[in-house]
UniProtKB/Swiss-Prot annotation:
It comes from Methylobacillus flagellatus (strain ATCC 51484 / DSM 6875 / VKM B-1610 / KT). Belongs to the HrcA family. GO terms for molecular function: DNA binding. Negative regulator of class I heat shock genes (grpE-dnaK-dnaJ and groELS operons). Prevents heat-shock induction of these operons. This is Heat-inducible transcription repressor HrcA. Transmembrane segments: none annotated. GO terms for biological process: negative regulation of DNA-templated transcription. Pfam families: HrcA (PF01628).
């Protein structure tokens, strides 16, 4: 563990580097840190910090810059977070006000982007968390069937399935009535589990039809468009990112395809609060030059998604962390109130 003087110098160095992006020299540190140390003592501590991998020397400068490890120690133990003022929180509450859940999610992403000037993202809740209210089968042709699924959060899904055999309109009405009578109020996961058990016991046409409907619904829940991203273009204005065209291209490809982004957000959903991935910690190459700050959001006590911000590793963590945290809480409140 670093002693108090080394911690103060590291904190001062990182705060200055985040502020202006310039390598920090020992002379500036001796003035800014408030420590009564000789330049030689400061250089010795800087060498110690460099040996431990917390700072590094760019080839073009005599100053030092923080490494990924340095940022991690800073965020975990040295950072002083700046809480949002009540007036700011009230403004955010007014923005996150809508009876439409999808509009709330879009607004939350835009809010994160506008407040941080980075990319804001909100994972769209998967349908697994919502309970079924109503299901209807409608014949389109001999084997093509339109499935209409309505969930308790007001979402409506229309899916076309290809049945193994022809069904009459009366068969489909009977199947719809049976499903609504036995499964209304259950979540998608619960219904899938029950149908799985029933399929093991009896291979009935009705059970197979319902299983096909659920499979079609599940595919939608896991699609690549399951995240709203706002402010991607902000990252083009971030000097730390825009100078590396190759890395920036990979990052935008990640935004386009979204599968790995969804996996990372899914992983963050298991956290109890704000989670921070610095540089390569995420395990995804396009984010090696970035930091990602995330927080789960919920409705009525149940976690249903994750939101966050993607920006450079040189970001004002003391400001971004509370913005992500309060946005997650306000989105949770707004979604719960809608229910």
């Amino acid at each position: 563990m670093l002693d108090k003087r080394a911690q103060i110098l590291l904190k001062t160095l990182i705060e200055h580097y985040i502020s202006d992006g310039q390598p920090v020299g020992s002379r500036k540190l001796s003035v800014a840190s408030g420590l009564d140390l000789s330049p030689a003592s400061i250089r010795n501590i800087m060498s110690e910090l460099e040996d431990h991998g917390f700072i590094a020397s760019p080839h073009t400068s005599a100053g030092r810059i923080p490494t990924q490890r340095g940022y991690r120690l800073f965020v975990d133990t040295l950072l002083t977070v700046q809480p949002l003022q009540n007036q700011e929180i009230r403004k955010l509450e007014n923005v996150l006000s809508s009876p439409d859940p999808q509009e709330l999610i879009n607004k939350a992403a835009e809010l994160l982007s506008s407040l941080t000037h980075f990319a804001g993202l909100v994972m769209i809740p998967k349908r697994q968390g919502a309970a079924f209210r109503h299901l209807e089968f409608l014949p389109l042709s001999e084997k093509r069937i339109l499935v209409i699924i309505v969930t308790t959060d007001g979402a409506v899904q229309n899916r076309i399935i290809l049945a193994e055999k022809p069904y009459s309109a009366s068969d489909l009405t009977q199947a719809s009535n049976f499903f609504n009578q036995h499964y209304a109020g259950n979540t998608l996961d619960e219904v899938k589990q029950k149908l799985h058990e029933e399929l093991k016991q009896m291979q009935s046409d009705m059970t197979r039809l319902m299983a096909a409907a659920l499979e079609a619904s599940s595919k939608t829940a896991d699609n690549k468009d399951g995240v709203v991203i706002a402010g991607k273009r902000n990252l083009l204005d971030v000097q730390d990112l825009s100078t590396n065209v190759s890395s920036l291209r990979k990052l935008f490809e990640m935004f386009e395809h979204r599968t790995s982004l969804m996996q990372l957000l899914d992983q963050s959903q298991k956290a109890s609060g704000v989670q921070i991935f610095i540089g390569g910690e995420s395990g995804y190459l396009p984010l090696d030059e970035c930091s990602m700050v995330t927080a789960p959001y919920e409705t009525n006590g149940q976690t249903i998604g994750t939101l966050g911000v993607i920006g450079p590793t040189r970001m004002a963590y003391e400001r971004v962390i509370p913005i992500v945290d309060i946005t997650a809480k306000l989105l949770s409140n707004a979604l719960s109130n809608n229910h």
